[in-house]
């Protein structure tokens, strides 16, 4: 790759990133040459399932985890202390979810390097799209990467409806950051609309693994870090590979996480959202998770300019219909609600010639006591059940829960989720649906995780809102 790093471009980018400090280069005329070399040779985060059992990456990860577990409780890099950072500070269900976890992963990776002495170490990721079982390196008695609280077994497989390639491709092709990366918020613990990346594969995998992974002390399970590295890979692919802009709203870009993290020596770190934009350009890169054909490879200078610029992103609605009626979902008891729409606007979402979309927002959702079920959404299918295949044309999407309604530490227990019904209603129309009606019948089906008997599988939904969104305008 042509990295396109002129001295002028580098200094502009380094100023925005704080790259000189992060890269450990703070003076002298050799800064540019040394940093250029380091960027070009930055560590590669690889798919853990593609590594041999004795690969140095896996061994370094094991050594790092063992060393963190052996640190005294007074050390901020201690294994439990690292998990408590997540418990006490992590944003979920809002637009700070992605940049906060990006910083969290980076400083954890730095701690691994410091404790093991392996400066070339890069945290691997678990590609649950290609390997739907917990990878082999996380199992075995005496293995620092094992966790005995897991509910999933070595043979358990995550369901394609949550992590399959079709689902991921749809998520990565979502152009609106507020739908992809979760909705607007003014504080990091405020609940907004949960985005499709967080609400579907992210939440599902936490519940699928279970045990420690099912609550906000989830970093106690070493799987956590590779799972979130996959989420990070998704964001990099969405933003830098597929060229979808992040929002440039100053409420987001200028927000500071202070001081949530600690550096490799255990000292507190203050991090601004905009500081994280160039991490995957300057500090690490990924072995490609989702190859995309036909895209021109861009220089790092081009990527840097695009990542920093972002765009003014809105989610505007031409019409919205709200149904307030508390629904209680249990496994084996689907619920249906009819939502009437204005005929002319509804037709605008049915035609491919227009870019209007039909978006369902489920509001004031109270999750189950245990995160051992998820919800599938169907359209005009009153007999839908947990066994209904997701390749049925009436299927629209899924969402899952991370944490239970006992987790009051993380703010309000109520959630909001968004599901795009556009393609489903368009596919149903040629089959005779909506010919004489602009009413949409929505079915919600509670589904248990595979090979698992739900303990307390009740979900309450107090509000359904069906909206016709205007075409996305980026400025």
Q: What is the meaning of each model-derived region?
A:
Residues 2-4, 8-95, 99-475:
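Intrinsically disordered, flexible peripheral segments
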């Amino acid at each position: 790759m042509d990295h396109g790093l002129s001295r002028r471009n580098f200094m502009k980018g380094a100023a925005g990133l704080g790259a000189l400090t992060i890269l450990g280069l703070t003076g002298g005329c050799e800064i540019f040459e040394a940093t250029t070399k380091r960027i070009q040779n930055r560590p590669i985060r690889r798919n853990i399932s593609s590594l041999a059992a004795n690969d140095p990456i896996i061994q370094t990860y094991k050594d790092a985890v063992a060393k963190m577990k052996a640190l005294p409780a007074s050390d901020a890099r201690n294994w439990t202390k690292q998990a408590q950072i997540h418990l006490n500070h992590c944003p979920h269900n809002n637009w700070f979810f992605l940049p906060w976890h990006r910083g969290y992963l980076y400083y954890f990776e730095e701690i691994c390097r410091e404790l093991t002495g392996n400066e070339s170490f890069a945290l691997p990721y678990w590609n649950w799209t290609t390997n739907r079982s917990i990878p082999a390196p996380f199992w075995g008695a005496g293995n620092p990467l094992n966790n005995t609280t897991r509910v999933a077994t070595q043979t358990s497989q995550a369901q394609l409806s949550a992590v399959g390639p079709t689902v991921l491709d749809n998520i990565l092709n979502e152009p609106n950051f507020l739908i992809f990366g979760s909705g607007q918020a003014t504080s990091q613990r405020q609940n907004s609309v949960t985005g499709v990346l967080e609400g579907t594969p992210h939440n599902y995998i936490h519940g699928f693994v279970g045990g420690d992974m099912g609550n906000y002390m989830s970093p106690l399970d070493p799987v956590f870090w590779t799972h979130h590295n996959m989420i990070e890979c998704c964001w990099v692919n969405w933003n830098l590979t597929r060229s979808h802009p992040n929002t440039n709203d100053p409420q987001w870009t200028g927000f500071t996480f202070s001081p949530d993290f600690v550096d490799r020596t255990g000292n507190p770190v203050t991090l601004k959202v905009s500081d994280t934009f160039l991490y995957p350009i300057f500090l690490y890169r990924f072995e490609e998770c989702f190859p995309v054909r036909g895209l021109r490879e861009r220089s790092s200078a081009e990527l840097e300019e695009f990542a920093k610029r972002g765009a003014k992103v809105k989610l505007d609605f031409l019409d919205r219909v709200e149904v307030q009626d508390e629904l209680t979902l249990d496994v084996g008891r689907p619920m249906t609600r009819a939502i009437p729409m204005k005929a002319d606007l509804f037709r605008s979402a049915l035609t491919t010639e227009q870019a209007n979309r039909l978006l369902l927002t489920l509001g004031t959702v109270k999750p189950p006591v245990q995160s051992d079920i998820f919800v599938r959404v169907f359209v005009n299918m009153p007999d839908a059940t947990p066994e209904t295949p997701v390749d049925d044309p009436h299927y629209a999407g899924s969402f899952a829960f991370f944490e239970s309604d006992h987790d009051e530490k993380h703010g309000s227990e109520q959630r909001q989720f968004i599901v795009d019904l556009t393609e489903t209603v368009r596919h149903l129309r040629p089959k005779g649906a909506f010919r004489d009606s602009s009413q949409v019948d929505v079915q919600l089906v509670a589904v248990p995780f595979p090979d698992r008997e739900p303990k307390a599988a009740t979900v309450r939904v107090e509000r359904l809102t069906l909206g016709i969104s205007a075409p996305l305008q980026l400025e």
